[in-house]
UniProtKB/Swiss-Prot annotation:
<dbReference type="GO" id="GO:0061629">
    <property type="term" value="F:RNA polymerase II-specific DNA-binding transcription factor binding"/>
</dbReference>
<dbReference type="GO" id="GO:0006325">
    <property type="term" value="P:chromatin organization"/>
</dbReference>
<dbReference type="GO" id="GO:2000144">
    <property type="term" value="P:positive regulation of DNA-templated transcription initiation"/>
</dbReference>
<keyword id="KW-0805">Transcription regulation</keyword>
<dbReference type="GO" id="GO:0005829">
    <property type="term" value="C:cytosol"/>
</dbReference>
<dbReference type="InterPro" id="IPR011442">
    <property type="entry name" value="TAF6_C"/>
</dbReference>
<comment type="subunit">
    <text>Component of the 1.8 MDa SAGA (Spt-Ada-Gcn5 acetyltransferase) complex, which is composed of 19 subunits TRA1, SPT7, TAF5, NGG1/ADA3, SGF73, SPT20/ADA5, SPT8, TAF12, TAF6, HFI1/ADA1, UBP8, GCN5, ADA2, SPT3, SGF29, TAF10, TAF9, SGF11 and SUS1.</text>
</comment>
<dbReference type="InterPro" id="IPR016024">
    <property type="entry name" value="ARM-type_fold"/>
</dbReference>
<dbReference type="GO" id="GO:0000124">
    <property type="term" value="C:SAGA complex"/>
</dbReference>
<dbReference type="InterPro" id="IPR046344">
    <property type="entry name" value="TAF6_C_sf"/>
</dbReference>
<dbReference type="GO" id="GO:0045944">
    <property type="term" value="P:positive regulation of transcription by RNA polymerase II"/>
</dbReference>
<dbReference type="GO" id="GO:0006366">
    <property type="term" value="P:transcription by RNA polymerase II"/>
</dbReference>
<comment type="function">
    <text>Functions as a component of both the DNA-binding general transcription initiation factor complex TFIID and the transcription coactivator SAGA complex. Binding of TFIID to a promoter (with or without TATA element) is the initial step in pre-initiation complex (PIC) formation.</text>
</comment>
<keyword id="KW-0804">Transcription</keyword>
<dbReference type="GO" id="GO:0016251">
    <property type="term" value="F:RNA polymerase II general transcription initiation factor activity"/>
</dbReference>
<dbReference type="GO" id="GO:0042802">
    <property type="term" value="F:identical protein binding"/>
</dbReference>
<protein>
    <recommendedName>
        <fullName>SAGA complex/transcription factor TFIID complex subunit TAF6</fullName>
    </recommendedName>
</protein>
Length: 516
């Protein structure tokens, strides 16, 4: 059996190799050498065509172009052939012409357009292309295209459109050129007239005009059902049974983990604001709303930066509200104590959310923390506030850092003197003053409320201990008379008395006056 390889192509690769060799001045080459070279050439050509067909297939085309062959050569680390025109790029069919040579062979060549050298030479040179660069910009933020130089100008787009199709763009531009379909009183006019006759400027007095409604934010049916289901579950009045609690936790978990809630975020924010302002007496519902806020803040798939300024009023309202949860059921000490615990727990939750927001979004809103500090300071300096407002304000102060707390520390003496009515009070009679419930001028707060406020102030001052150096050696030392005098001048008698009773009084006093 013969093992000689045979070519099955319609052209003769051996003759082609022989012609190329003769053009290079190589004659009398052995036929075996020509066959070996021809088979290698044929393999290389098939390899190039195979790669070119891959590019054609990935480009979703049916016609193999010279550009595919050039890319195949580059993949095979071969310099591509230059000067071959790809007619497919200009939607022009590639055509070949046939010429019969003297030897009886047919030669095909590509029909190309003849170019006049005079016209080609006298044409101006094309502009030098710019170097390719890459940059990033926001194509859209929450579905709204930002007005930056990289994005097309909406006003230019509007002007380029005929007047009768500008309606969808007018709302986005907040323009006064409202598009109105005109119904004329004459029989010749109709709503299918030219665009110029439909513009508002061409509406004559006496004509009936109808203003199109503004473009609404359209939600899918699935999102509407989801929103209504979540809202009804979270606002259900009877949540004592196990099934209702299970549904509530499932809704909160969904808000915390689902990644397709971007379109519903503004609706949830509006719902939160409405529920807080309308239900300040319902502690259970307010607690659920705070859990809802925490779930949205914990969802890593939602971009909440544009909505933080809308969430902060809701959090601060529950933190500083004058009255939460209505009133106690009766005047018994036990009921009043439990009512204070419930309302204070809600304010503690709001303070923890405030701390979470300030730590999670420090770069998005650099003015967020100063604005919160100013709000708390303004509330702190108002001596006509009630216990709940002061408690929430002090809990909010305790989540701030040391430098912010020192702003309040400078006004603490005046605040304590006015709020706790410390006129004529010293360390010698402070304990008797605090225990004298029969004195109506003792303070405007009850003994329990006063103790809670003092403990909250001290918990905020304990944050200042972080400013002390690691090698602080004052732990366990006794407080001197000079330290007591400075403490009372800075914090007032009531707060200073409770600080001096602590085991870490010396360390806390050093933290209060650290750096002075």
């Amino acid at each position: 059996m013969s093992t000689q390889q045979q070519s099955y192509t319609i052209w003769s690769p051996q003759d082609t190799v022989k012609d190329v060799a003769e053009s290079l001045g190589l004659e009398n080459i052995n036929d075996d050498v020509l066959k070996a070279l021809a088979m290698d050439v044929e393999y290389r050509i098939l390899e190039i065509i195979e790669q070119a067909v891959k590019f054609k297939r990935h480009s979703k085309r049916d016609v193999l172009t010279t550009d595919d062959v050039s890319k195949a050569l580059r993949v095979l680390n071969v310099e591509p052939l230059y000067g071959y025109y790809d007619g497919s790029e200009v939607n022009k069919a590639v055509s070949f012409s046939k010429v019969n040579t003297s030897g009886g062979q047919s030669v095909y060549y590509l029909d190309e357009e003849e170019v006049d050298f005079d016209r080609l030479i006298n044409e101006p040179l094309p502009q030098v292309p710019r170097l390719p660069t890459f940059t990033t910009h926001w194509l859209a933020v929450e579905g709204v295209q930002p007005a930056i130089i990289q994005n097309p100008n909406l006003n230019d787009i509007r002007v380029s459109q005929p007047p009768f199709i500008r309606g969808a763009i007018v709302t986005a531009l907040n323009d006064n050129s409202l598009q109105t379909p005109v119904t004329s009183t004459t029989a010749s006019a109709s709503v299918t007239d030219t665009g110029a006759s439909q513009h508002l400027s061409n509406v004559k007095p006496g004509q009936n005009t109808e203003v199109k409604p503004l473009v609404k934010h359209v939600l899918s049916k699935e999102l509407q059902i989801y929103f209504n289901k979540v809202i009804s579950t979270l606002t259900a009045k009877s949540q004592a049974d196990e099934a209702a609690q299970h549904m509530k936790q499932a809704a909160l978990t969904s808000l915390r983990t689902d990644s397709g809630l971007h379109q519903l975020v503004p609706y949830f924010i509006q719902f939160i604001a409405e529920q807080i302002t309308q239900n300040l007496s319902d502690l259970q519902l307010l607690t659920t709303i705070l859990e809802m806020i925490y779930s949205l803040l914990s969802n890593t798939s939602i971009f909440l930066d544009p909505y933080i300024h809308s969430l902060m009023p809701s959090i601060l309202t529950l933190l500083l509200a004058k009255k939460l949860g209505g009133s106690p059921k009766d005047d018994s000490p036990q009921e009043i104590h439990e009512f204070l615990e419930r309302t204070n727990a809600l304010r503690d939750f709001a303070a923890s959310l405030l701390d979470y927001v300030l730590k999670k979004f420090p770069q998005a809103y650099k003015s967020l923390k100063p604005r919160v500090t100013r709000t708390l300071l303004k509330t702190f300096l108002d001596i006509n506030r009630v216990f709940g407002t002061y408690y929430g304000c002090l809990k909010g102060v305790s989540v701030l850092e040391g430098e912010s707390i020192r702003f309040f520390l400078g006004n603490l003496n005046n605040w304590a003197r006015l709020v706790f009515n410390e006129s004529g009070i010293t360390l010698d009679n402070i304990e008797e003053h605090l225990n004298d419930d029969s004195n109506p001028t003792r303070t405007k707060f009850t003994k329990e409320e006063t103790q809670i406020l003092v403990d909250t102030v001290i918990s905020a001052l304990l944050v200042l201990k972080k400013d002390l150096p690691d090698l602080y050696e004052g732990k366990g030392e006794k407080v001197t008379d000079e330290d007591k005098e400075k403490l009372l001048e800075r914090c007032g008698v009531t707060i200073g008395f409770h600080i001096l009773k602590r085991d870490d009084a010396k360390e806390l006093i050093s933290a209060i006056f650290f750096g002075e």
